[in-house]
């Protein structure tokens, strides 16, 4: 079994409240989950208006499949969501045999 994760540090556009932030993030997180078939959630910086951290994780039988899903999530955020700026992305891959 392989477990992979990617964590995105994001800068949001012209956001002035947490309510505005949620209205931007909710569809992005839903899109990530739907199009990558992985779990996605806001995992840090919940109290900041213009910054957030989104995590995506996937469990699969092969490392290649996990890498493919994480790469797809990375491309999706970078190419299809102009309302955000990806400041950094960190990822990890672990085997159940580790």
Cite the ranges covered by each PLM segment.
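N-terminal first-folded block
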Residues: 1-39
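Short, charge-patterned binding micro-sites
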Residues: 3, 40-62, 94
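A structural signal for short, well-ordered beta-strand segments
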Residues: 6-10, 54-56, 89-91
